[in-house]
């Protein structure tokens, strides 16, 4: 769905031709999207609900404590789902805390470093990582789609199934079948009587919606004939598959503001490009990298740019000005520029666009920018991560329970290398993509991961290839970063300035050969504290008024 929030749509008339004619919701939103939103918000799929319910259509007498409050960087807030059980929205918020100091809108992300899980298991009380924001995560792009910070899921449907039947919903690795049965039970027995069903699907039950033959179903809720199932005769797995498809469709339609041609229009940066008649996206046949180099050449030669100020609009959900001025412009040039034979931080060249390619501001790939090493060394001392013993492929896979993430085949695995560092456990670290690559319990993403690993290294032998995945994490989009703090896969940085300073430190380590498996792009980064304000201002200019209206 094309989300128009906050800023008026005059944006597209600023040097960009006629204003767009948006499709109507009925034309642009498939039925699976609307049904998927309801499923995304449904609180009845978790282990806690299964264990405490009296009837799928009755409220719980006591809610899951995990949703009683929401942890934020500024302290806890009352949970919007208190008295109920966990749902997808419990970690991927949007407008639940709109206008609340220290919280505000989110881009389908949370407010803290790592989210609490409903049921402690395998030593975990929190998720291993920060909740990556979902808006734009399924934006069309070249190359494979790999989801989660470590690429463990090859499709959004796989991600949904893994979530509904996994730890984040309170299910132990040995309880996957029970989780599937709970999803199927809710879908079969739901009668559409709760407020969520009234608001999202006109009070129709899931069984009615999935069958798709009732004349009361409006066109916007009518699932295509090829996808319909009779839940009374379908298998539990078939029901889960359709649930996953609906939620995945909903996820795929979570987009930042765009016009009818898919061009971004919602942020001060987007307005700046348009009013200065700058290219807003690659030309036909032009790669994103080529577009970014061309954009740099143009902005470096731009004379007398027109600045964006309050006359172009105002934020509805943010307390700072809607602006793109000289400081943001300087930050844009630093962001796009790559250093030449960098030996220090003096070139005002961030090389950020090597991974965060405009206009999406992500390459959807995996890189090690030193975040895991910084966290590990903060616990165990400088240089400790460089000396951490990481097993070979044979050693790792032959000792699955010792090293790899828990699964239904290995329910007692310790997940040594998908944990936050701990002073009492010196082997605990998060190695990112290393956990998924060549993992026999994660077969679906292997072809795509191997293609990426072998495309970026000359030596693609199994041990070298595995070594090249150490501490690599998926590149998030930088759009609307203001609404996804705290930042990075571990939520370790609270401000944009803190993130930039971390990259300054890690680029220095990379040039000195002191950053383990460093992304080569870091060596072409040459920035200093002098560049922090401009880069942070530019990143802030990617903010827009996102909501889920």
List each model region and its residues.
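Periplasmic c-type cytochrome electron-transfer domains
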Residues: 14-549
């Amino acid at each position: 769905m094309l989300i128009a929030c906050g800023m008026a749509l005059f944006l597209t008339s600023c040097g960009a031709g006629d204003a767009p004619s948006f499709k109507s919701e009925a034309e642009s939103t498939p039925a699976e999207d609307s049904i998927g939103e309801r499923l995304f918000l449904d609180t009845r799929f978790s282990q806690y609900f299964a264990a405490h319910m009296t009837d799928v259509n009755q409220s719980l007498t006591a809610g899951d404590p995990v949703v009683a409050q929401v942890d934020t960087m500024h302290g806890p807030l009352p949970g919007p789902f208190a008295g109920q059980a966990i749902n997808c929205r419990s970690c991927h918020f949007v407008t639940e805390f709109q206008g609340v100091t220290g919280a505000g809108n989110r881009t389908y992300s949370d407010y803290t470093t790592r989210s609490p899980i409903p049921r402690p298991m395998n030593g975990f009380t929190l998720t291993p990582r920060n909740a990556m924001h979902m808006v734009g995560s399924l934006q069309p792009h070249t190359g494979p789609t790999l989801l989660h910070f470590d690429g463990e899921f090859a499709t959004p449907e796989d991600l949904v199934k893994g979530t509904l039947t996994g730890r984040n919903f309170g299910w132990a690795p040995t309880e996957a079948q029970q989780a599937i049965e709970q999803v199927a039970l809710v879908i079969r027995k739901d009668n559409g009587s709760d407020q969520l069903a009234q608001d999202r699907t006109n009070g129709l039950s899931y069984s009615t919606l999935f069958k798709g033959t009732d004349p009361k179903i409006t066109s916007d809720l009518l699932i295509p004939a090829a996808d319909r199932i009779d839940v009374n005769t379908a298998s539990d797995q078939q029901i889960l598959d359709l649930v996953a498809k609906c939620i995945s469709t909903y996820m795929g339609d979570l987009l930042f503001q765009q016009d009818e041609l898919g061009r971004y229009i919602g942020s001060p940066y987007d307005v700046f490009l348009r009013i200065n008649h700058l290219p807003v996206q690659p030309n036909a046949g032009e790669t994103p990298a080529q577009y970014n180099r061309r954009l740099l050449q143009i902005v470096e030669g731009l004379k007398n740019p027109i600045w964006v100020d309050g006359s172009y609009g105002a934020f509805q959900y943010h307390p700072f000005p809607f602006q793109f001025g000289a400081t943001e412009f300087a930050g844009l040039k630093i962001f796009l520029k790559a250093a030449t034979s960098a030996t220090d931080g003096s070139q005002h060249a961030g090389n950020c666009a090597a991974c965060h390619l405009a206009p999406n501001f992500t390459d959807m790939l995996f890189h090690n920018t030193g975040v895991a090493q910084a966290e590990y060394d903060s616990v165990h001392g400088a240089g400790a991560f460089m000396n951490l013993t990481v097993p070979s492929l044979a050693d790792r896979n032959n000792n699955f329970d010792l090293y790899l993430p828990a699964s239904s085949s290995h329910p007692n695995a310790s997940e040594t290398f998908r944990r936050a560092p701990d002073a009492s456990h010196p082997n605990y670290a998060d190695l990112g993509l290393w956990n998924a690559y060549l993992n026999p319990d994660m077969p679906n993403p292997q072809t795509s991961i191997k293609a990426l690993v072998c495309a970026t290294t000359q030596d693609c032998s199994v041990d070298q290839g595995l070594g090249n995945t150490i501490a690599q994490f998926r590149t998030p989009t930088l759009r609307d970063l203001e609404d996804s703090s705290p930042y990075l896969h571990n939520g370790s940085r609270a401000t944009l300035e803190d993130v930039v300073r971390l990259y300054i430190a890690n680029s220095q380590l990379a040039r000195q050969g002191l950053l383990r498996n460093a992304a080569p792009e870091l060596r072409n980064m040459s920035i200093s504290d002098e560049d922090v304000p401009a880069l942070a201002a530019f990143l802030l200019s990617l903010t827009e008024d996102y909501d889920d209206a």
